[in-house]
């Protein structure tokens, strides 16, 4: 659903990706930007945590991108000036026929936003709720993250990692970070014996 909505920019005004901290929301937003670029569209993915110290003016001009991804948007809930700035950005994005994708820890109506017009706008498009990933989803995410890092991760090694790694996606991706660092340092490919030795499995 997310992929098809992203490929029809201008049809859905906003996509809200909602879920807990370890459900891979940031990874999904990065994938949305990557998909847009593959489709010859301009895209930007920004973290509200990084923008917050810069003030609401840092949002100006973002509507010029075809796809605008705002990660951790719930960080500005209750901040009146930020909420208004996001509301106006949404309207500008909509006027351009572009797409806004936001990630939130909960559904928009469940968060302490003061500006109800913003809540209604964020609820107006496609809402995707993320929960526990199935194993095949986790495998796909693991393989995609490895590819982004330039790591060669074979199917059998990926399945081996999945069988022994914690269920949380954040823990799984942290394991990949460790393997990446160690394989670079040792100049070794990711094999099952190497993974065992690094992780003590």
Where are these regions (language model features)?
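Conserved AAA+ ATPase "SRH/arginine-finger" region at the nucleotide-binding site
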Residues: 125-137
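Pre-Walker A adenine-sensing motif
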Residues: 1-8
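Conserved P-loop NTPase "ATPase switch" module shared by AAA+ and STAND
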Residues: 61-85, 89, 96-104
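Conserved AAA+ ATPase "sensor/coupling" helix adjacent to the nucleotide-binding pocket
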Residues: 125, 139-152
């Amino acid at each position: 659903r997310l992929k098809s909505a992203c490929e029809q920019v201008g049809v859905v005004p906003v996509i809200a990706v909602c879920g807990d901290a370890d459900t891979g929301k940031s990874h999904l937003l990065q994938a949305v930007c990557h998909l847009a670029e593959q489709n010859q569209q301009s895209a930007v993915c920004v973290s509200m945590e990084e923008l917050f110290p810069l003030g609401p003016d840092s949002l100006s001009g973002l509507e010029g991108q075809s796809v605008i991804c705002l990660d951790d948007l719930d960080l500005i809930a209750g901040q009146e000036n930020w909420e208004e700035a996001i509301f106006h950005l949404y309207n500008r994005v909509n006027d351009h026929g572009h797409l806004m994708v936001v990630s939130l820890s909960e559904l928009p109506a469940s968060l302490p936003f003061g500006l109800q017009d913003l809540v209604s706008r964020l609820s107006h498009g496609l809402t995707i709720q993320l929960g526990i990933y199935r194993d095949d989803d986790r495998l796909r995410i693991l393989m995609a993250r490895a590819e982004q890092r330039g790591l060669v991760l074979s199917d059998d090694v990926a399945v081996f990692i999945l069988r022994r790694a914690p269920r949380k996606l954040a823990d799984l991706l942290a394991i990949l970070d460790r393997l990446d660092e160690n394989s670079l340092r040792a100049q070794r490919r990711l094999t099952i014996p190497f993974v065992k030795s690094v992780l003590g499995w």
